[in-house]
Design a protein with these regions (language model features):
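Sec-dependent N-terminal signal peptides
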Residues: 4-14
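Boundary regions of SH3-family modules and the immediately adjacent low-complexity/disordered segments
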Residues: 19-146, 188-217
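Long, low-complexity, intrinsically disordered N-terminal extensions of eukaryotic proteins, enriched
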Residues: 13-16, 178
Length: 217
């Protein structure tokens, strides 16, 4: 019985590691211009060119396993990905810059993160904020980070805080984005009491930190 319990706990831990989502404002260690959906094996280069020096090659298999070939070490998923969903087969890295068909991406590490250019012709795809919320957000919905203040949950009539408020988000069943303007997203909210609300939500602060994310899990 004890062995079965230990095996069950290991299984739960293994399964949990296969889903990495940010739930707090500081869960994402890098502020970027969007996200890049990446494919394995992922080759990261110093320059946006096929001739650029290879900085790292990342392998992952959507089963809680990821390894770096250059450093020859197994990596923690939450130290690499901004979001990683085994069930949706989605792996996202923070994007810092773009150049034609290349994206500069960065691992989600605090100290000495690995950053490099990845080729979009190899199946990787960059999403700016508008595309990220309009494509993924409309499909899966959004969720708010757990450590938001009440002021962060207020809905406005326009995409600025100087406009009138239209309500606030309490316990949402679903948040659906419709339009992105700067750091604001127009959302339709189905709240806990089935009350429908519409308004502009400030999804990113002036420092570039996100307050909401796509509900992949």
């Amino acid at each position: 019985m004890k062995k079965l319990l230990i095996a069950f706990l290991i299984f739960l831990n293994f399964a949990a590691l296969a889903e990495v989502m940010p739930y707090y404002i500081n869960s994402l260690k890098r502020n970027g211009i969007g996200f890049t959906s990446v494919q394995s094996p992922l080759v990261m280069r110093r320059m946006p060119s096929d001739d650029g020096e290879i900085l790292e090659t990342l392998n992952f298999d959507y089963a809680a396993n990821a390894s770096c070939l250059i450093n020859k070490q197994r990596c923690s998923l939450d130290e690499i990905f901004a979001a990683y969903s085994e069930s949706k087969k989605i792996a996202l890295l923070t994007t810092l810059d773009v150049s034609e068909n290349w994206s500069m991406v960065c691992f989600n590490q605090i100290d000495r993160p690995i950053c490099g250019w990845v080729d979009e012709k190899l199946g990787n795809k960059y999403y700016n904020w508008s595309d990220f919320f309009n494509i993924y957000g409309r499909k899966y919905g959004l969720y708010m980070f757990k450590d938001l203040q009440k002021a962060d949950k207020v809905l406005y009539a326009g995409h600025m805080k100087q406009t009138n408020t239209t309500g606030s988000i309490e316990l949402p069943k679903r948040i659906t984005p419709w339009l992105v303007q700067g750091n604001w997203v127009l959302v339709k909210v189905n709240d806990f009491n089935n009350q429908l609300k519409t308004g502009w939500l400030n999804y990113r602060d002036d420092r570039g930190k996100l307050k909401v994310f796509v509900k992949f899990d």
